[in-house]
């Protein structure tokens, strides 16, 4: 089968002929229709320090996808051949305390599809049936293929009550932009998103952000005054991993504010903890999606009228995968879809 593999311990990714994956008794075999390129895939492509420590070589990568079930393990129940599915990319152990308590998103032994095991940049993918999610008929393949990052946005955005609240999102990558759309859809008052990438800030405006602020050109505090905000933001969503962005968030949060953090800093990050203490801030770390509450919420949000389609900006056939990675690497894109049909 065709597959995109990390063949060498250097920058790049390669289109190869790989063996079709073997299926176990509790697995599904999925014929991939569409995949999306994630920021994690770009780290692997660029072979940065994290990738060098984490990714086995050679390995098929990728973890954002939609496809069709073409074979079913003999112990599997609840799926049939022909089902259209995406899937949770975190394979959990099932036996740690959090797994046994139903908090599988907090499994301490998680294995990542396309990170620690063979991924979805291929014509076929095998995953445990437990990890598969059936896609409703009224949700397109394009949208289903980005459910993984959309789930990050939904999990982060819905961590705290948003109705009538003022929300600051730092980082206008695709996940931050989708989070802005979610916040507006569920009833936040002002949703302000910050970045220095004007292309992506314009995408955020299209997706419903109240203000998309280029912090290299405009003061966040001036924007707050313009919006009539006198007491700071109620909810903060940190999506960038950039220390200066988090410092700005701490400066502008209201007392009693709540922060959900998805962005991963490049290393240790010092902050002024007195602001956290004296403001009584709550900070929550976010990793992945709640299994599977976030997945049901994603489907429901789209079915209730949330439109995240503008975040998809580029489509390529798999043979043109290099154009897709170039688009992602340029910073002048939203989500990039690769078609395997």
UniProtKB/Swiss-Prot annotation:
NAD(+) binds at residues 175, 195, 200, 262-264, 286-287. It is found in: Cytoplasm. The active site is at 40 (charge relay system), 43 (charge relay system). The gene is tdh. It comes from the Bacteria. InterPro entries: ADH-like_C, ADH-like_N, ADH_Zn_CS, GroES-like_sf, L-Threonine_3-DHase, NAD(P)-bd_dom_sf, PKS_ER, Zn_alcohol_dh. GO terms for biological process: L-threonine catabolic process to glycine. The record marks 148 as: Important for catalytic activity for the proton relay mechanism but does not participate directly in the coordination of zinc atom. Zn(2+) 2 binds at residues 93, 96, 99, 107. The keyword Secreted does not apply. Its cofactor is Zn(2+). Homotetramer. The keyword Glycoprotein does not apply. Its main location: cytoplasm. Keywords: Cytoplasm, Metal-binding, NAD, Oxidoreductase, Zinc. Catalyzes the NAD(+)-dependent oxidation of L-threonine to 2-amino-3-ketobutyrate. Binds 2 Zn(2+) ions per subunit. Zn(2+) 1 binds at residues 38, 63-64. Belongs to the zinc-containing alcohol dehydrogenase family. This is L-threonine 3-dehydrogenase.
């Amino acid at each position: 089968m065709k597959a995109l593999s990390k063949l060498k311990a250097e920058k790049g990714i390669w289109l190869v002929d790989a063996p079709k994956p073997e299926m176990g008794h509790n697995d599904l075999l999925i014929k991939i229709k569409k995949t999306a390129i994630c920021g994690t895939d770009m780290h692997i492509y660029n072979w940065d320090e994290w990738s060098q420590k984490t990714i086995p070589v050679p390995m098929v990568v990728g973890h954002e996808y939609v496809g069709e079930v073409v074979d079913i393990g003999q112990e599997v129940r609840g799926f049939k051949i022909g089902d259209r599915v995406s899937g949770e990319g975190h394979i959990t152990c099932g036996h740690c305390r959090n797994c046994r308590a139903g908090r599988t998103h907090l499994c301490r032994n998680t294995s990542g599809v396309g990170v620690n095991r063979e991924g979805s940049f291929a014509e076929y993918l095998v995953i445990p049936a437990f990890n598969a999610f059936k896609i409703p008929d009224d949700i397109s393949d394009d949208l289903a293929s980005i459910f993984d990052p959309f789930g990050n946005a939904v999990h982060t955005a819905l961590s705290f009550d948003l109705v009538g609240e003022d929300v600051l999102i730092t980082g206008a990558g695709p996940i931050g932009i989708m989070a802005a759309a979610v916040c507006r859809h569920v009833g936040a008052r002002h949703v302000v998103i910050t970045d220095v990438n004007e292309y992506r800030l314009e995408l955020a405006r299209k997706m419903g952000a109240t203000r998309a602020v280029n912090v290299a050109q405009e003061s966040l505090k001036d924007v707050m005054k313009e919006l009539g905000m006198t007491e700071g933001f109620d909810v903060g969503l940190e999506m960038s991993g950039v220390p200066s962005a988090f410092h700005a968030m701490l400066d502008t949060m209201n007392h009693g504010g709540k922060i959900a953090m998805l962005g991963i800093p490049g290393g240790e990050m010092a902050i002024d903890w007195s602001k956290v203490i004296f403001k009584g801030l709550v900070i929550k770390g976010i990793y992945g999606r709640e299994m599977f509450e976030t997945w049901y919420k994603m489907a429901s949000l789209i079915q209730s009228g949330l439109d995240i389609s503008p975040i998809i900006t580029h489509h390529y056939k798999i043979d043109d995968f290099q154009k897709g990675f170039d688009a992602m690497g340029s910073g002048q894109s939203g989500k990039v879809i690769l078609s395997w049909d």
